């Protein structure tokens, strides 16, 4: 069903509701068409998932017979979790005739017992597996062999791919690399939001995926293109959003896609011409809705960690967190304590490091923190 609001904050519908990224899309299409896997790196909420789905949409337009798969492994905690998610995403999706699908699954997946159910509308089998820890590696190999046996060209996107480095099992990277490297009909997009970890995985000569992909790092959508997209959709609804007001929104959040999109979604929903007063009202509404969540989140951190978080938020971006001027300006503790606090905030992704310095990961949380007193 066509969205009521053109400014989507989750999911993907069609190119009509997707802004720009023409160069990045072209890069992905060219790589996949020519048999190259892609390592797609972007901060969370910059739009990498939408870009993947847009690229898959375009691929299906050009080659209707291909099969695309998308799995987000952010919540997986082990190889077993990964295998079960991979199985439920892939198994049964390569054949249009249910009986043929069942036959092929049983032919390849022998290390565990698949459980089949059927979609009431399409008849396509849905498969879940219960795999014993001792069989996880074999089951993963069988699923990949099942993909490789298809006469169809397949494209698989694995989002938050760096999560496999957190699994307790050793050697998952090497295992996966060894299973996929000789597939002739399957290509992968490995997408991730932890930039340093992803770069280490794909550019270090010591890692299994070294030089096995074409790297692609994305940043904000071009401001002019985004402005045309936004003002155009308001205009189609007989509403006015001036380029100056859009620019103020874009610059406030430095083009970070989800936050810009979230605010535009609110403004469009008000069904009024947009002025700066309405923008301020929308921001107040959003921060009010998140305020309890943010306050509750801070309860898990020490006073020193919270104080550092607020200090970074007040500055916006801090080049040297351990600099004496910064520590004294916000009456922080000793440099060693600040260093330990920073490490904790980085690990929990409340703060992230850019080329310019340290920033609050959640732009709305940063704004909420700036409104809080010390």
Where are these regions (language model features)?
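A short, basic N-terminal segment
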Residues: 1-38, 43, 61-62, 352
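C-terminal leucine-rich, beta-strand-based interaction scaffolds used for sensing/assembly
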Residues: 2-7, 292-374
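Short, locally clustered residues in the helix-turn-helix/winged-helix DNA-binding domain
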Residues: 32-33, 254, 268, 310-317
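P-loop NTPase nucleotide-binding core
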Residues: 42-46, 50-155, 336
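Conserved Walker B catalytic segment
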Residues: 126-194, 203
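Short regulatory helix/loop adjacent to the ATP-binding pocket of P-loop NTPases
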Residues: 195-213
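Conserved AAA+ ATPase "SRH/arginine-finger" region at the nucleotide-binding site
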Residues: 214-225
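Amphipathic alpha-helical "lid/sensor" segments that cap RecA-like P-loop NTPase cores
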Residues: 227, 231-293, 303, 355
């Amino acid at each position: 069903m066509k969205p009521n609001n053109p400014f989507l904050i989750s999911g993907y519908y069609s190119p009509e509701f997707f802004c720009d990224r023409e160069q990045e899309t072209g890069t992905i299409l060219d790589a996949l068409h020519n048999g190259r896997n892609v390592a797609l790196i972007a901060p969370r909420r910059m739009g990498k998932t939408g870009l993947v789905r847009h690229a898959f949409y375009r691929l299906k337009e050009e080659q209707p017979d291909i099969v695309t798969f998308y799995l987000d492994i952010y919540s997986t905690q082990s190889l077993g979790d990964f295998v079960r998610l991979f199985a439920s995403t892939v198994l049964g999706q390569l054949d249009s005739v249910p009986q043929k699908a069942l036959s092929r699954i049983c032919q390849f997946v022998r290390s565990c017992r698949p459980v089949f159910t059927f979609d009431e509308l399409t008849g396509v089998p849905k498969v879940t597996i219960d795999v014993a820890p001792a069989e996880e590696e074999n089951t993963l190999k069988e699923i990949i062999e099942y993909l490789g046996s298809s006469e169809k060209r397949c494209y698989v996107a694995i989002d938050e791919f760096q999560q496999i480095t957190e699994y307790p099992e050793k050697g998952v990277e090497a295992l996966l690399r060894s299973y996929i490297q000789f597939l002739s009909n399957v290509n992968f997009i490995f997408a991730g939001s932890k930039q340093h970890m992803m770069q280490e995985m794909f550019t270090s000569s010591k890692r299994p995926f070294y030089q096995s992909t074409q790297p692609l790092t994305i940043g904000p959508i071009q401001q002019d293109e985004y402005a045309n997209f936004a003002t155009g959709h308001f205009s189609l609804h007989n509403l006015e959003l001036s380029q100056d007001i859009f620019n103020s929104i874009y610059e406030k959040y430095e083009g970070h896609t989800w936050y810009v999109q979230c605010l535009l979604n609110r403004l469009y929903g008000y069904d009024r011409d947009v002025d700066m007063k309405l923008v301020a009202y929308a921001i107040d509404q959003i921060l009010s809705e998140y305020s309890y969540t943010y306050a509750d989140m801070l309860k898990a951190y020490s006073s020193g960690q919270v104080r550092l978080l607020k200090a970074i938020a007040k500055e916006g971006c801090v080049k040297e967190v351990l600099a004496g001027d910064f520590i004294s300006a916000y009456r922080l503790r000793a440099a060693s304590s600040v260093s330990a606090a920073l490490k904790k905030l980085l690990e929990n992704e409340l703060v992230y490091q850019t080329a310019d310095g340290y920033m609050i990961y959640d732009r709305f949380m940063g704004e909420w923190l700036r409104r809080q007193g010390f």
